[in-house]
């Protein structure tokens, strides 16, 4: 991990590998996470996960290592932490993850846990920030759980959805929408690891006939490992955004799977889209088309690329659409004029902000704050975390057909806000 990436994750985004691992483990009901490290790392990881997963404050705990632990080892700290979890009496399994510093000590964490002899299985791994950012930590935790899977008899017409996370912005709602779409097409969803699936459901994952990867940075390593171990084919399909984009996503998935039927389901969604777009046409007759001088989309790859494509192909007109990706991807977006990778092209990204004139920003609070500090005009709504100045309380997703309605609504409200600002300035 480069110095730039480490400083970005540890000091600004609060989303290092430790956080990613904790997010995956804590998403499994009945699981407790023991972070073997100082309270600093624990509070940052726990708070980030707890913002979206209400169990985190109860199921993530910490050994609270001291400087002397770096000299004498962390055995006593681990034993105390396991004792607290045992006394709570709610754990079904425990995951122990080392932070950066304790991972360098070389303690036999697995041996210490086995010697403790708790009433539940214990799984161990190193996952500090030096091991990577959130995505790497999440993916490594997923792989650790794949190690526990056993061969299962294949269930025809079934899939796992890999790469979902309930700590992404609207992550839980997106997971529910993906399950709704697939089940509406007659596809049996075995598991969605990282997004609400139980341990039993995840252990049944090898019975799926196919793995659909919706976020490469989170799910692709596990998909490759499951193909190797259980001969389950996989495909990277991204997340669906927009009305037309979601329809094309369904058709693409069914073509890949060669099972499922979508005609009836898509007919119902077409009616939903027609009614929503009718309302948009009414606004357009009053205020004109959805035009923005510039558009900036900054988010993880699946969100950024999918939403950018839906924006330009379905809803808005703009002179320039720029994407800032928060992690690497092999995918691209024909609708974008410029695509940059955060931490790899920071000088170009700095110039993008300095040269910004006005327009629509779809991002997290980090990007909008940066524009505010430069006194740049813009309208915005958030599609990624952190979101410090915008609340999300409804059960609507950002992805899929139901998510398209929310995005279209927010785009129109942003345009109306921009029109109101222009009238005030005149």
Q: Which residue ranges define each predicted feature?
A:
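An N-terminal assembly and electron-transfer interface module characteristic of large anaerobic redox
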Residues: 1-426
């Amino acid at each position: 991990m480069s110095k730039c990436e480490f400083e970005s994750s540890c000091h600004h985004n609060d989303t290092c590998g430790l956080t990613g691992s904790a997010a995956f483990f804590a998403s499994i009901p009945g699981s407790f996470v023991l972070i073997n490290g100082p309270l600093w790392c624990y509070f940052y990881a726990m708070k980030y996960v707890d913002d979206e997963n209400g169990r985190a404050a109860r199921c993530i705990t910490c050994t609270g290592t001291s400087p002397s632990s770096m000299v004498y080892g962390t055995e006593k700290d681990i034993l105390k932490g396991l004792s607290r979890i045992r006394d709570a009496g709610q754990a079904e399994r425990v995951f122990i993850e080392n932070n950066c510093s304790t991972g360098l000590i070389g303690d036999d964490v697995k041996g210490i846990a086995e010697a403790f002899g708790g009433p539940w299985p214990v799984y161990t791994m190193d996952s500090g920030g030096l091991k990577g950012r959130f995505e790497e930590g999440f993916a490594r935790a997923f792989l650790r759980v794949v190690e526990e899977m056993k061969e299962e008899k294949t269930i025809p017409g079934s899939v796992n959805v890999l790469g979902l996370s309930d700590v992404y912005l609207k992550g839980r709602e997106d997971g529910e929408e993906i399950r709704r779409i697939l089940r509406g097409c007659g596809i049996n969803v075995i598991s969605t690891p990282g997004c609400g699936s139980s341990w039993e459901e995840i252990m049944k994952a090898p019975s799926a006939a196919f793995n659909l990867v919706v976020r490469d940075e989170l799910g692709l390593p596990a998909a490759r490992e499951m193909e190797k171990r259980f001969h389950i084919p996989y495909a990277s399909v991204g997340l669906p955004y927009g009305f037309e984009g979601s329809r094309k996503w369904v058709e693409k998935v069914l073509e890949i799977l060669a099972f499922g039927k979508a005609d009836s389901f898509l007919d119902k969604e077409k009616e939903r889209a027609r009614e929503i777009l009718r309302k948009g046409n009414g606004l357009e007759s009053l205020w004109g088309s959805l035009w923005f001088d510039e558009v900036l989309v900054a988010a993880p790859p699946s969100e950024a690329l999918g939403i950018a494509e839906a924006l330009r192909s379905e809803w808005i007109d703009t002179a320039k659409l720029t994407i800032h990706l928060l992690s690497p991807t092999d995918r691209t977006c024909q609708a974008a004029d410029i695509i940059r990778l955060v931490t790899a092209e920071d000088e170009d990204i700095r110039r993008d902000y300095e040269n910004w004139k006005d327009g629509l920003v779809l991002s997290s609070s980090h990007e909008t704050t940066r524009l505010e500090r430069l006194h740049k005009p813009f309208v915005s709504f958030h599609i990624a975390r952190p979101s410090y100045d915008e609340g999300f309380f409804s059960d609507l997703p950002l992805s899929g057909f139901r998510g398209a309605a929310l995005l279209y609504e927010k785009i129109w409200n942003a345009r109306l806000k921009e029109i109101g600002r222009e009238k005030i300035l005149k």
